[in-house]
A protein has these predicted regions:
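N-terminal beta-strand/alpha-helix entry module and adjacent surface
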Residues: 1-129, 135-194
Length: 194
């Protein structure tokens, strides 16, 4: 037999704690205050992408570019009491990778070039996933895209951000339960210029 005990005082304390500050996820993690919500992000996994990165990725995926384009997303992942939080604060154009979905691959040479750029322009940031722009192909993924993700970006905290600039659609995917799962939304955050 399982006995469930309800402590009214603990529940009240927990509710007050949750109401204090929605931007304070845990003692060590403070979320950006100046944000824009896209979609309906899940409370257990949050993705925050810096506005600069969004602008850069939009430039890469600009309308008129008929070829698939890609970039490597950089940032950090944090664990908190409220769940996992991924911050994307940089991106490196993957010019040296041909994004033809039938032949795409991240070679050792491509990764060497990417890591050299990361070290030079974004020291301290980690690879958090990748960006793919496919004009006119929607934000749906196929087996080849999923295979590329699993082979090159293993782990639960790695993301795929895919756009279709023709339809002005975008979506984040994360690897969950053995497959890439489309996320319900994300946040764009704005840093103050110093």
């Amino acid at each position: 037999m399982i006995e469930v005990i309800y402590d009214k005082d603990k529940e009240k304390d927990k509710q007050e704690s949750n109401e204090k500050n929605e931007h304070e996820v845990s003692v060590n993690l403070r979320l950006p205050k100046n944000i824009r919500q896209i979609g309906s992000p899940d409370g257990h996994k949050r993705i925050y992408m810096e506005d600069y990165v969004v602008t850069y990725l939009n430039y890469i995926a600009r309308p008129g570019s008929t070829q698939a384009r890609g970039a490597i997303l950089l940032g950090e992942s944090k664990k908190s009491d409220a769940g996992d939080v991924i911050f994307i604060s940089g991106a490196v154009d993957a010019q040296n990778i041909e994004f033809d979905m039938d032949e795409s691959e991240f070679t050792q040479e491509a990764w060497t070039t990417i890591y050299d750029q990361v070290k030079q322009f974004f020291p301290g940031l980690s690879v958090m996933g990748w960006f793919l722009s496919r004009m006119g192909f929607s934000t749906a993924i196929n087996d080849k895209i999923e295979k590329m993700h699993v082979e090159n970006f293993p782990g639960k905290d790695k993301v795929l951000f895919i756009t279709d600039s023709l339809e002005s659609e975008d979506a984040f995917y994360m690897y969950e339960h053995g497959q890439l799962v489309k996320q319900k939304g994300y946040y764009i955050y704005y840093e103050k210029n110093e």
